[in-house]
Amino acid sequence: MKSFVLATCLLGFAQIIYADNKELKIIRKDVAECLRTLPKCGNQPDDPLARVDVWHCAMAKRGVYDNPDPAVIKERSMKMCTKIITDPANVENCKKVASRCVDRETQGPKSNRQKAVNIIGCALRAGVAETTVLARKK
């Protein structure tokens, strides 16, 4: 019985890791595709993970900003934190930053695209991109 429980736990753990790796591959592919298709302006950083336009493109492909409701954007942003960051402390920091940025940047009369760009810029200024798995595997 103990062996069965252990095998079941290991199988569940392997499925979680596989799903996370699959999601990361998709996000990496989205970032690479966005980097290829978006023009780089002269004043933009060389690091693609420091570019707001690349993150906006990749997150838009994942549907993070499809719904203009701030609560939905916050929920989807927090889910994205768990997909692109593995360290639990950094995940919690990412969630706090995402919540703060969504709350701040969704105030006032701006287009949904501008709100999304502002949210990403806020998160990048807070250093979230440096804690992602993507930053470690450039």
From Swiss-Prot:
User: Which residue pairs form cystines in this protein?
Assistant: 34-57, 81-94, 101-122
Q: Which residues form the signal peptide?
A: 1-19
Could you list this entry's UniProt keywords, alphabetically sorted: Allergen, Disulfide bond, Secreted, Signal
Lineage top rank: taxon: Eukaryota
Q: Which residues are listed as membrane-spanning?
A: none
Is Signal given among the entry's keywords? yes
Query: What family does this belong to?
Result: Belongs to the ant venom allergen 2/4 family.
Subunit comment: Homodimer; disulfide-linked.
Which protein is depicted?
A: Venom allergen 2
| Lineage per the UniProt record | Eukaryota, Metazoa, Ecdysozoa, Arthropoda, Hexapoda
